């Protein structure tokens, strides 16, 4: 029974993946761009508000003024 359930779930996943990718090839570039934008980390420029040094592009944050150096 367990083997049948695993085979059924695998078949469902393969069918779903094939169906969803077939009709959405034109959106591939958009999805790729969205994924890249989420992976890219932005840093806070000089004099920007900061709470931790690693948010600043310079990796230095003034704790009293809460500004990047």
Curated annotation (Swiss-Prot):
Disulphide-bridged cysteine pairs: 43-57, 50-61, 56-68
Chief location: secreted
Tissue expr: Expressed by the venom duct.
Domain of life (superkingdom): Eukaryota
Signal peptide: 1-17
UniProt xrefs under InterPro entries: Conotoxin (IPR004214)
Key word Cell membrane present: no
One GO CC annotation: extracellular region
GO MF terms, alphabetically ordered: ion channel inhibitor activity; toxin activity
Subcellular localization, as worded in the UniProt entry: Secreted
Keywords: Cleavage on pair of basic residues, Disulfide bond, Knottin, Secreted, Signal, Toxin
Propiece span(s): 18-40
Pfam families for this protein: Conotoxin
Domain notes: The presence of a 'disulfide through disulfide knot' structurally defines this protein as a knottin.
Similarity field: Belongs to the conotoxin O1 superfamily.
Protein name according to UniProt: Conotoxin AbVID
Organism this protein belongs to: Conus abbreviatus (Abbreviated cone)
